[in-house]
Amino acid sequence: MFTTAFAQREQTQPGGLPLDLFAAIESLKKELNAVILAHYYQEPDIQDIADFIGDSLQLARAAAQTNADVIVFAGVHFMAETAKILNPEKLVLLPDLNAGCSLADSCPPKEFAAFKAAHPDHLVVSYINCSAEIKAMSDIICTSSNAVKIVQQIPKEQPIIFAPDRNLGRYVMEQTGRDLVLWQGSCLVHETFSEKKIVQLKVAHPQAEAIAHPECESSVLRHASFIGSTAALLQYCQTSPSQEFIVATEPGIIHQMQKLAPNKHFIPAPPINNCACNECPFMRLNTLEKLYWAMKNRTPEITMSEDIRLAALRPMQRMLEMSN
């Protein structure tokens, strides 16, 4: 069923890999009663073998609703942690434990605890792209899909800390008119996009629409016809009459865009420097080979203390309730 060049190359590698990785993974899924959840930023082969592909909110909902005994999370560490928070009794596997997140890493728990203590009357709304420890210090979690909706439901007289992404925080401020206290974190991928090069692309492709993720800087967002989460970007490119799009987010999503709108053309937004990469180095640590070995060996497993899990669960549950 799956015959990509990547899979064919892996079949010839030494080290005990099966001849057909895709078939072996499908067999392990049945043996383990496992589900593979993958983010849109994963490499195409992983997206193609996943049981569910989505953005952070969709993946959180899928993790909360699954009947599988094993969750294999093809994403980054905080996403797999989220699955474990919602499913303490299940085995949650991450193909590569080094698949971290520059945004999550930009908000260390000790420093954030001090920041929170300096604003004792503030409600803490944290973007899901943060560690379990930060979630445990939060009142409500949000995603790029529902951040505006979440903040709009909070009484206007209630002051708010928004963490960790300053760019998403600024976008939420613009959309809601609320004055948020922002933690100054950011995503290395979404801050590499070049405003100048996007403008040049728009000149070279006058019929193209620029679409962007709200983690991008304001200088990039101002040139976008549409701003939204990865799921929203996918939906927009299917329904828009435009035939060409400049895409300002991690280019892994273009695989799904091309599958869902095969007659349209998608141009990845270029980075500031030619040597810079707009691919997430952490997302790309996961490979089909690592996915197989994680399932075969039932490791690396995501674990956390029960007190952190319970504290992180409460704001996650509030998000899911407020997003319905």
From Swiss-Prot:
As its record notes, the protein acts as a catalyst of: iminosuccinate + dihydroxyacetone phosphate = quinolinate + phosphate + 2 H2O + H(+)
Q: Pathway it acts in?
A: Cofactor biosynthesis; NAD(+) biosynthesis; quinolinate from iminoaspartate: step 1/1
A Gene Ontology annotation in the biological process aspect, one of them, is:
'de novo' NAD biosynthetic process from L-aspartate
Give binding positions for [4Fe-4S] cluster.
C101, C187, C280
The enzyme class is transferase
Q: Where in the cell is it found?
A: Cytoplasm
Q: Which GO terms describe its molecular function?
A: 4 iron, 4 sulfur cluster binding; metal ion binding; quinolinate synthetase A activity
Q: What is its EC number?
A: 2.5.1.72
Tell me which GO cellular component terms the UniProt record holds: cytosol
Q: Does the keyword Hydrolase apply?
A: no
* Gene3D superfamilies recorded: NadA-like (3.40.50.10800)
The cofactor binding remark recorded in the entry reads: Binds 1 [4Fe-4S] cluster per subunit.
Q: Which cofactor does it need?
A: [4Fe-4S] cluster
Question: What positions does the entry give for iminosuccinate binding?
Answer: H39, S56, Y127, I128, N129, S144, H213, P214, E215, T230
InterPro entries assigned to the protein according to its UniProt record, in alphabetical order:
NadA, NadA_sf, Quinolinate_synth_type2
Keyword field: 4Fe-4S, Cytoplasm, Iron, Iron-sulfur, Metal-binding, Pyridine nucleotide biosynthesis, Transferase
Q: Which HAMAP family match?
A: NadA_type2
- What does the similarity note say? Belongs to the quinolinate synthase family. Type 2 subfamily.
What role does this protein play? Catalyzes the condensation of iminoaspartate with dihydroxyacetone phosphate to form quinolinate.
| PANTHER family associated with the record | QUINOLINATE SYNTHASE, CHLOROPLASTIC, QUINOLINATE SYNTHETASE A
User: Any idea what this protein is called?
Assistant: Quinolinate synthase
What organism is this sequence from? Nostoc sp. (strain PCC 7120 / SAG 25.82 / UTEX 2576)
Gene this chain is encoded by: nadA
